[in-house]
């Protein structure tokens, strides 16, 4: 025999007007806040990722690709100096 926890059923919740009044405001506002977070560039600043125009600088236009098998440490040091 199962007991009653006193909680409302899911169907009862999503058919109530109160649910839709609350969520018709919060869901679009979360979408707009996320869009503004990304479109203003604040996401780049918060997470520290480079902006699309900062991947390649004027001095370094090539891809930092390690080609040597035995001198890879020297190439890594060279790449890290260019940053």
From Swiss-Prot:
Heme binds at residue 23. It comes from the Eukaryota. Heterodimer of an alpha subunit and a beta subunit. PSII is composed of 1 copy each of membrane proteins PsbA, PsbB, PsbC, PsbD, PsbE, PsbF, PsbH, PsbI, PsbJ, PsbK, PsbL, PsbM, PsbT, PsbX, PsbY, PsbZ, Psb30/Ycf12, at least 3 peripheral proteins of the oxygen-evolving complex and a large number of cofactors. It forms dimeric complexes. The chain crosses the membrane at residues 21-35. It is a single-pass membrane protein. With its partner (PsbF) binds heme. PSII binds additional chlorophylls, carotenoids and specific lipids. It holds the Pfam family Cytochrom_B559a. Gene3D superfamilies: Photosystem II cytochrome b559, alpha subunit (1.20.5.860). Its cofactor is heme b. This b-type cytochrome is tightly associated with the reaction center of photosystem II (PSII). PSII is a light-driven water:plastoquinone oxidoreductase that uses light energy to abstract electrons from H(2)O, generating O(2) and a proton gradient subsequently used for ATP formation. It consists of a core antenna complex that captures photons, and an electron transfer chain that converts photonic excitation into a charge separation. Its main location: plastid. Belongs to the PsbE/PsbF family. GO terms for cellular component: photosystem II reaction center; plastid membrane; thylakoid membrane. Coiled coil: none annotated. This is Cytochrome b559 subunit alpha. It is found in: Plastid membrane. GO terms for biological process: photosynthetic electron transport chain. GO terms for molecular function: electron transfer activity; heme binding; iron ion binding. PROSITE patterns: CYTOCHROME_B559 (PS00537). Keywords: Electron transport, Heme, Iron, Membrane, Metal-binding, Photosynthesis, Photosystem II, Plastid, Transmembrane, Transmembrane helix, Transport.
